[in-house]
């Protein structure tokens, strides 16, 4: 096979970029589907890719995606186990020691309901309709330390336990129209324009608390502040008295009432038949929440003896009060009602607002050993409500027997370096069946893994004249 030599400077720059990416990345979930050369859904990661298909179609089961990231919560850290490996004792101190100062939990899910790709001449048009759920929470270790060590470990105003949380949850529909073209034999570009309809949104604007014990009197002093905003379906609303209700009417029209817009853009450049590079940006956009918005706030109220200068000050109970609480149900309920008055949640209608999508950036380098085997290195990062989260992945993808695609990946994530993934895609006539995960260990220990991604689907690749991605000249066939 005739080979075209790339300029030496191109290769040096590509290798240098990948080395810098490896040195700076920490991690976020990546799916082996993104690297599968025979899987049409690789376009989700790289809209500029030149697929070797004339048409692609899927309905309901084309792509089902579940993604979990959990930096520190572990089942094994919560318990002490007996000789048979069964949980015997809850060890809160051990659990608290296993936490980081800042911890993260993320949950993302996607379900493609309809997909259609159609090639006209050398250009590819795409259409996707699906539902996405994105959620992430960043939280401190303060609450777990308080449970594990007790308030006696936090003596003095200068040594409080700090409890913080940043929560973001969003669900929406996505209707996307895309276009891919080969500008030259070396350069391909692609993109998608997305019409979005928000279903649900919850976001914290402030959520923190501080507690310490006075070293002389052992009184507990607590300060807290909570502020959240949300957009809910009509089934959830705030009534005239300010109470949150969940018995409102619901109609299908509510699924189309919070409009938004987003775009994906990508470019792929082939230095020669072996080296190529990809740059992409996904989910650059927003959703306008204009219906049934509400706010939630919680600040300490002056409800009596335990209120002191904006703080909840608990100096203890005398024996008579303790006896009444333990033996008198009416007194106990009255006491608890009084405590609740200090920490009342207030709901109120909220004006219209916008939220940005979780924008994702991607840089990838590919090396094709031959027309059946590819090695890739990828740096990826996502702007979440709780901050920026990067990722680094190396991948191998092999094609066998013209109808079997196997992909192996390794991904680095924050506080986790054991994410070995595997994906298999099989062609049966025009039917492409695939199953992937980015963490094989997570399949066997889901309660003790730092991250897990699973994707499964069945896609129909129609009118495929040639299954080889690269022809005898070493150039992708649709570039001729």
Language-model segment annotations:
Residues 101-105, 138-171, 231-237, 409-480:
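Outer-membrane beta-barrel translocator/channel fold
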Residues 26-133, 137:
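N-terminal, post-signal peptide beta-strand-biased segments of exported outer-membrane/organellar beta-barrel
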Residues 41-43, 107-112, 169-175, 259-263, ...:
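Residues that define the transmembrane beta-barrel architecture of outer-membrane proteins
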Residues 252, 372-383, 392, 402-415, ...:
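Transmembrane beta-strand segments that form the barrel wall of outer-membrane beta-barrel proteins
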Residues 59-61, 127-129, 189-191, 267, ...:
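Membrane-embedded beta-strand positions of outer-membrane beta-barrel proteins
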Residues 55-57, 123-125, 186-189, 274-277, ...:
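Repeated loop/turn-to-beta-strand initiation elements of outer-membrane beta-barrel proteins
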Residues 47-49, 109-118, 127, 175-183, ...:
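Residues on the lipid-exposed face of transmembrane beta-strands in outer-membrane beta-barrel proteins
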Residues 63-67, 131-135, 195-199, 281-288, ...:
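Transmembrane beta-strands of outer-membrane beta-barrel pores
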């Amino acid at each position: 096979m005739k080979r075209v030599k790339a300029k030496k400077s191109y290769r040096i720059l590509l290798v240098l970029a990948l080395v810098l990416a490896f040195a700076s990345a920490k991690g976020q979930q990546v799916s082996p589907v993104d690297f599968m050369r025979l899987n049409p859904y690789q376009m989700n990661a790289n809209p500029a890719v030149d697929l070797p298909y004339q048409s692609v179609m899927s309905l309901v089961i084309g792509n089902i995606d579940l993604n979990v990231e959990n930096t520190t919560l572990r089942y094994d850290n919560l318990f002490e186990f007996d000789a048979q490996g069964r949980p015997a004792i809850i060890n809160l101190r051990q659990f608290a020691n296993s936490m980081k100062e800042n911890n993260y939990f993320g949950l993302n899910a996607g379900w493609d309901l309809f997909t259609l790709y159609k090639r006209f001449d050398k250009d590819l048009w795409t259409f996707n309709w699906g539902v996405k759920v994105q959620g992430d929470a960043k939280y401190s270790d303060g609450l777990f330390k308080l449970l594990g060590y007790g308030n006696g470990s936090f003596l003095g105003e200068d040594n409080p336990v700090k409890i913080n949380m940043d929560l973001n949850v969003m669900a929406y529909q996505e209707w996307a129209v895309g276009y891919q073209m080969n500008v030259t034999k070396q350069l391909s570009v692609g993109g998608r324009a997305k019409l979005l309809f928000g279903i649900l949104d919850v976001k914290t604007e402030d959520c923190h608390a501080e507690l310490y014990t006075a070293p002389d009197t052992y009184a507990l002093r607590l300060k807290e502040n909570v502020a959240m905003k949300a957009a809910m379906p009509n089934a959830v609303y705030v009534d005239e008295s300010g109470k949150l209700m969940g018995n409102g009417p619901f109609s299908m029209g509510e699924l189309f009432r919070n409009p938004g817009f987003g775009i994906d853009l990508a470019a792929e450049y082939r230095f020669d038949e072996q080296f190529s590079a990809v740059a992409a940006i996904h989910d650059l956009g927003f959703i306008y929440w204009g219906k049934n918005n509400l706010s939630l706030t919680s600040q300490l109220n002056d409800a009596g003896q335990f209120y002191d200068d904006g703080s909840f000050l608990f100096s203890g109970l005398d024996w008579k009060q303790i006896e009444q609480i333990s033996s008198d149900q009416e007194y106990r309920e009255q006491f608890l009602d009084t405590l609740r008055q200090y920490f009342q949640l207030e709901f109120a209608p909220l004006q219209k607002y916008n939220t940005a999508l979780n924008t994702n950036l991607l840089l990838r380098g590919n090396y094709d050993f031959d027309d059946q085997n590819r090695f890739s290195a990828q740096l990826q990062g996502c702007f979440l409500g709780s901050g920026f989260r990067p990722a680094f992945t190396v991948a191998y993808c092999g094609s066998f027997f013209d109808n079997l695609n196997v992909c192996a990946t390794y991904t680095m994530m924050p506080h986790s370096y054991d994410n070995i993934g595997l994906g298999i895609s099989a062609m049966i006539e025009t039917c492409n069946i695939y199953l992937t995960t980015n963490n094989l260990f997570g399949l066997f220990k889901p309660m003790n893994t730092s991250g897990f991604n699973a994707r499964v689907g069945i896609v129909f690749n129609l009118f495929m004249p040639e299954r080889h991605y690269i022809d005898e000249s070493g150039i992708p066939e649709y570039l001729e």
